[in-house]
């Protein structure tokens, strides 16, 4: 846990999933402080929109203004709810919207934590363009190293005149005034042909590797299991290309597409509808934090390309949680398949959780591993 003192309230905040005590990561950053310093209670008029509030620092600080928290991360929503509870703040003080929803009209203040993906930022700025006014105060913040010329140019292009502040504690702010500059329309998704198939893969703005098949997925697809039955999970599904391939290779199986990103799940659904509509009755689409709340002993197999970062921070906490959830939800003799960068040493992590691990394939960068749920472990 960490403490954030600001002009609105003193907060105790924690990351979600929680980090270990040996390598603790803070649930807020200097950019959060810097953004809050710009506001005065007396100047907030109209709806408050907060975009990409990773762990709820801004939402908790401004809870009395009933802000809207907008983003593409279910984990961030869970983190914000947890931190609201931790600080004794009514959860209903914050209204949650995903990035594909319609934003509230004529906001008084918009606070943006600049996301890692420029495409997501553009999608969000285009959505804001429909609702902000010249009187809306628009402020964005991030680590100084993450604000580039291209970031400023995007604000200028979509919203209007943009300036940046001096760095403070290695954070920098962007101030923008809306003047409705001319702007061409843009498609909601980017699409490309998947080589070796007749499929067209569609990707919403925040999908990993949205402009082409990433090399880890490419390697994984060469080693996917075939002729499985029952339920299979594409965990952390992204655009669903792994799950789509599983549907094709396992015609007797049902595939559950799971991701914490609403845009990822929407992309997966769109890709099944577009490329294998006849298989829709064998699909389930789930926005979730890994397999939270899913009953144990349900699945025959779980397939996963786990992330090793959360927002801008490098961490294996998300992957570790995915592995534990997979083990809980697999049937006895059910199998977990993962692809990962070799340097992450997931072999020993899986062996610790499952009691076994087998290397299926390896190249100079990636490894495909399999672990089997052999029985109940104390």
Swiss-Prot record:
It comes from Escherichia coli O1:K1 / APEC. Keywords: Cytoplasm, Methyltransferase, rRNA processing, S-adenosyl-L-methionine, Transferase. It is an enzyme of class 2 (transferase). The lineage of its organism: Bacteria, Pseudomonadati, Pseudomonadota, Gammaproteobacteria, Enterobacterales. This is Ribosomal RNA large subunit methyltransferase G. Its EC number is 2.1.1.174. Belongs to the methyltransferase superfamily. RlmG family. The keyword RNA-binding does not apply. One of its GO terms (molecular function) is 23S rRNA (guanine(1835)-N(2))-methyltransferase activity. The keyword Chaperone does not apply.
């Amino acid at each position: 846990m960490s403490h954030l003192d600001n002009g609105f309230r003193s907060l105790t905040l924690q990351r979600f999933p929680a980090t270990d005590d040996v390598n603790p990561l803070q649930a807020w950053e200097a950019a959060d402080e810097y953004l809050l310093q710009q506001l005065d209670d007396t100047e907030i008029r109209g709806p408050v929109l907060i975009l990409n509030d990773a762990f709820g620092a801004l939402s908790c600080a401004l809870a009395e203004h009933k802000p809207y928290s907008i983003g593409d991360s279910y984990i961030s929503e869970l983190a914000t709810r947890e931190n609201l509870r931790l600080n004794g703040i009514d959860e209903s003080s914050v209204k949650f919207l995903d990035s594909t929803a319609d934003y509230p009209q004529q906001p008084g203040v918009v606070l943006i934590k600049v996301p890692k993906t420029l495409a997501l930022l553009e999608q969000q700025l285009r959505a804001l363009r429909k609702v902000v006014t010249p009187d809306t105060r628009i402020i964005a913040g991030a680590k100084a190293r993450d604000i580039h010329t291209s970031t400023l140019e995007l604000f200028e292009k979509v919203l209007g005149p943009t300036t940046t502040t001096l760095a403070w504690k290695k954070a920098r702010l962007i101030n923008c005034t809306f003047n409705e500059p001319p702007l061409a329309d843009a498609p909601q998704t980017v699409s490309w042909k998947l080589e070796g198939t007749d499929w067209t893969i569609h990707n919403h703005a925040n999908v990993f590797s949205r402009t082409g098949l990433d090399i880890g997925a490419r390697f994984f697809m060469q080693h996917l299991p075939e002729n499985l039955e029952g339920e299979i999970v594409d965990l952390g599904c992204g655009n669903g290309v792994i799950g789509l391939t599983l549907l094709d290779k396992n015609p007797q199986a049902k595939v559950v597409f799971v991701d914490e990103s609403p845009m990822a799940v929407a992309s997966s659904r769109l890709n099944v509808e577009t490329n294998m509509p006849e298989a829709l009755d064998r699909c389930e689409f789930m926005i979730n934090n890994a397999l939270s709340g899913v009953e144990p002993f349900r699945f025959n197999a779980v397939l996963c390309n786990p992330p090793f970062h959360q927002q801008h921070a490098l961490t294996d906490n998300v992957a570790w949680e995915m592995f534990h959830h997979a083990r809980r939800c697999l049937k006895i003799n059910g199998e977990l398949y993962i692809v990962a960068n070799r340097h992450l040493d997931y072999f020993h992590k899986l062996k610790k959780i499952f009691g076994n691990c087998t290397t299926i394939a390896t190249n100079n960068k990636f490894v495909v591993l399999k672990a089997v749920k052999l029985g109940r472990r104390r």
